[in-house]
Amino acid sequence: MKTLLLTLVVVTIVCLDLGYTMTCCNQQSSQPKTTTNCAESSCYKKTWSDHRGTRIERGCGCPQVKHGIKLECCHTNECNN
């Protein structure tokens, strides 16, 4: 009986996806789109210019950035593309 109850709990957790994760884009600059699942509740896109031109970094969370770097944070799946 305990095994059946444990199985039902596990199936419920899997079906309800209680450990919801965000899907954020993580490709750099003009690379083809790639995504990753994140535990954070936000995605970011950092943009800056250097000797190679405009650079873009995407990922999970909402990091602090240095002066001169544009940061955009958002809260929906793949919102940082």
Curated annotation (Swiss-Prot):
Signal sequence bounds: 1-21
GO function terms (MF aspect): acetylcholine receptor inhibitor activity; ion channel regulator activity; toxin activity
Statement: the UniProt record of this protein carries the keyword Secreted: yes
Keywords, in A-Z order: Acetylcholine receptor inhibiting toxin, Disulfide bond, Ion channel impairing toxin, Neurotoxin, Postsynaptic neurotoxin, Secreted, Signal, Toxin
Expression by tissue: Expressed by the venom gland.
Annotated disulfide bonds: 24-43, 38-60, 62-73, 74-79
Any Gene Ontology CC annotation: extracellular region
Domain of life (superkingdom): Eukaryota
InterPro entries in the cross-refs: Snake_3FTx, Snake_toxin-like_sf, Snake_toxin_con_site, Toxin_cobra-type
Function: Binds to muscle nicotinic acetylcholine receptor (nAChR) and inhibit acetylcholine from binding to the receptor, thereby impairing neuromuscular transmission.
Name of this chain's protein: Short neurotoxin 2
